[in-house]
């Protein structure tokens, strides 16, 4: 019974970690699109910063997945 409980707890923890990463990536994309809309000339710099932010958010999500399993 305790093994099943540990598996369920790990799955829930990894789901919350990945949910947070998905929300973070979505917010970064939203704000990057807004920033490009306000200042189209800086789209190159905004894109680079957005990709770095998305990579960090996804990295934390993957870390949560591995730590929970």
Model regions and ranges:
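Hydrophobic, small-residue-rich transmembrane alpha-helices and their short perimembrane loops
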Residues: 1-69
């Amino acid at each position: 019974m305790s093994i099943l409980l540990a598996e369920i707890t790990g799955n829930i923890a990894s789901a919350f970690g990945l949910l947070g990463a998905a929300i973070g990536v979505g917010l970064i994309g939203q704000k990057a699109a807004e920033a490009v809309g306000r200042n189209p000339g800086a789209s190159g710099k905004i894109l680079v910063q957005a990709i770095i932010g998305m990579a960090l958010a996804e990295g934390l999500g993957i870390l949560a997945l591995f730590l929970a399993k």
